[in-house]
Amino acid sequence: MTRITGISLRRVLDSRGNPTVEADVLTESGGFGRGAAPSGASTGEYEAIELPANESIAKAREHAVPRLEGVYAGDQRAVDNALRAADGTDDFSAIGANSAVAISMAAAKAAADVLGAPLYQHLGGAFRGENFPIPLGNVVGGGEHAKEATHIQEFLAAPVGAPSVSEAVFANAAVHAAVADVLDERGVPAAKGDEGAWAPPISDADAFEVVDEAVDRVEEDVGFEIRFGLDMAAAELYDDDQEAYVYGEETKSTDEQIDYVADLVDEYDLAYVEDPLDENDYEAFAELTDRVGDRTMICGDDLFVTNVERLQEGIDTGAANSILIKPNQIGTLSDTFDAIELAARNGYETIISHRSGETEDTTIAHLAVATDAGFIKTGTVGGERTAKLNELVRIADDAV
C-alpha cells in the first residue's frame, strides 16, 4: 500500500525569494506527501551540498526518481538509502541535498497519510515522550542575517517557564513586540532580518540591554520565567589570517572569546549559546563547556552539522552539550535520526531548527515532537516561521 508510484519535483520560492526544491510523493494506495527544502545563510563548512534548484531537480529526476519508484514509503531507511545510492557521494553533491531532503520528508508524509496518522506519530516510535519542545524565538538579529546590525547573529527569547506550548509561542511573540517598543523608546529605527527578527543598527552591548529589558517586561506580564540565548555564528566572525574573532574594529583571541562568552552567560543568565566558537575548534568548545556547561546549553550547529562523525568527535572531546538538528544539513530524515539517537545516548540535548531561507513546510515541528526534543528554533514572526509554530500548537492540542 505504501509503495511509491510517483515523484514530482518543482521549483518554489523560499522566504528570501530564492528558488528551492519542492517534492511530491504518491503511493499506490493514494497516499500523498509534500516536502520543501529550506536553505541557510550562515552555512557550516561541512554541510551537505545544496545545488542550484534547477540543477538539483534535473539530477534527481535522472538518478533518484527511477530508484525510488517501487520503494515502500513506510520504510524511511529504504527511501533514504535509495537516495544515497542514487547520489553516490558522501555529501549529496551529485543530486543536491535540497532535492534529497525534500523527497525524504515528502515520503515520510506520504507514509503517514496512508496510515491516517499525524507525521509526528509516524516518525516518533519509541522516541516520543510526554514533553513538548520549548520554542526559541529570534527577536534581534544581525550577522549573516542582517549585515548592518549586530555582530552576534541571533538574540533568542527562551520561555523556559511556560506551562504550555501555546503560552510559550505567544510569549516569544510578545518579546518580539516588546523589543520594538524598547527600540522605539530609544529612537532606534529597525528593519527586519532574514528570519523576521528586528535588525537595529546598534552595538551588541546595546542589543543585550534592549533584549534584557524586553524579556523583563514580558516576564512580568505573563508570570513565568523567560530567559534568552544567542546564536553567535562564530565561524562567520573568525578570521583565519588574524587567528581572531573580529567584531568590527575589535578582535578577540580564542581565550578572550571564551572569557567573553562565559561572562555573558553569567551576566545575563543565558539559557543557550549556539556556535560561540569556530566550527573547527573542538578544544575551545570543550574548554567553554567545562566552564559554563553546568548552567547553560553550549550548542554545536556549524560544529556538528547534524553529522554523526562530527558529533562523535565532539562527544569524545567534551565539546558542547547540545546539538542543533537541521535535516537539510545532512540530506535525509534517516541521517537526521542517527544524529539525534547518538546525541540522546550521550546526554546531549537536541534542538530542532529551521533555516534562514524557509518555506511553509512544517516537518520540523513534527520532528521536534516525535523525537522528544527539548527545544525548537523556528523564529517568531513571518508566515514561514508561524507555519511551524502554529503547527506545534495544533500538535500539542491534538496530543494532550
UniProtKB/Swiss-Prot annotation:
It holds the Pfam family Enolase_N. Keywords: Cytoplasm, Glycolysis, Lyase, Magnesium, Metal-binding, Secreted. (2R)-2-phosphoglycerate binds at residues 153, 326, 355-356, 377. It is found in: Cytoplasm; Secreted; Cell surface. Mg(2+) binds at residues 231, 274, 301. It is an enzyme of class 4 (lyase). GO terms for molecular function: magnesium ion binding; phosphopyruvate hydratase activity. Its cofactor is Mg(2+). CDD domains: enolase. Pathway: Carbohydrate degradation; glycolysis; pyruvate from D-glyceraldehyde 3-phosphate: step 4/5. InterPro entries: Enolase (IPR000941), Enolase-like_C_sf (IPR036849), Enolase-like_N (IPR029017), Enolase_C (IPR020810), Enolase_CS (IPR020809), Enolase_N (IPR020811). Its EC number is 4.2.1.11. GO terms for cellular component: cell surface; extracellular region; phosphopyruvate hydratase complex. It catalyses: (2R)-2-phosphoglycerate = phosphoenolpyruvate + H2O. Binds a second Mg(2+) ion via substrate during catalysis. Its main location: cytoplasm. Belongs to the enolase family. PANTHER family: ENOLASE. NCBIfam families: eno. Catalyzes the reversible conversion of 2-phosphoglycerate (2-PG) into phosphoenolpyruvate (PEP). It is essential for the degradation of carbohydrates via glycolysis. This is Enolase. It comes from Halorubrum lacusprofundi (strain ATCC 49239 / DSM 5036 / JCM 8891 / ACAM 34).
